[in-house]
Amino acid sequence: MAFRHQIVIIAQPVGKMKSPPGADCSKTRRFLQARGALAFAVKLRYNVGAKGGNGEMETRQTKQTSAGRRAALVLAALLLLALLLCALTMTRVYPAMPEALQVLERPADGVTVRRGAERIDFIPAHPQAGLAFYPGAMVQFEAYAPLMERLAVRGVLCVLLRMPGNLAVLNPDVADGVQADYPEITRWFLGGHSLGGAVAANYLEKHGGEYDGLLLLAAYSVADLSGEQLRVLTVYGSEDGLLERDRLESGRALLPADAEEVVLPGGCHACFGSYGAQPGDGVPTITRAQQQEQTADLAAAFCLENAA
């Protein structure tokens, strides 16, 4: 009886995501390409068959060939791992600014901050709507604390979600179960910044009936939500140097017909969060605080209107 080993390497794609939106993306592409190459599957199949009636032993040459294939497979895996580590080294993580971390220690009056291992909740005294938020790629998620606090002051309970490796694509279903923790809130929205917004939109392609709307900050959808019963608000700055305008344009056709879009005069890509400047972004003509205040006004009005 002979055993024949067949080793098949299958490259697995990262997912259905197209080029992620915004600035986080240029540095993230190397990571995603390396990750896609590394995420391979090895199938080892043992084919058992009788050859006549005398039992056939594997020849020395076959053994050597199998050993050579295994060695080549191990070498390929090591090379791919080295490529991934190199990509990670080249990818910068944007840390939260001190002002963002201070919000977590001393939130505004009427706002309670509840910190968990995988998320931070910003809870108003009388929440009227809920927002689960996906941060941008390679940004320390605490950097969005000032914006979340501003929304909570306006009556929107915000759940800021932590992403593994600071990449939403590595855990796109992180919003699962968020609503169950606050059963008293009956209207929920999903939002995200840049790549986080695109991943949030992808999530709603499968979970659209669970949310009332989508908030896209400097982001566009690559998922077809045109047939969903969702309200959508897109907000971006006039000086954003990282949001791909052609993708934004083509993404409009994927949104419901009544989707809203607002341009913040003088706003940039990075100032939705509090993590400093990003290479390639435009020069804002308004302050970070002003951009976040205007965004909070728009987002709160959007959520609370739909929660009425």
Question: Where are each of the predicted segments found?
Answer:
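N-terminal membrane-anchoring alpha-helices
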Residues: 57-110
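Short alpha-helix in the alpha/beta-hydrolase fold that links the catalytic acid
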Residues: 147, 243-253
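Conserved alpha/beta-hydrolase
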Residues: 148-168
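A conserved short beta-strand
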Residues: 210-219
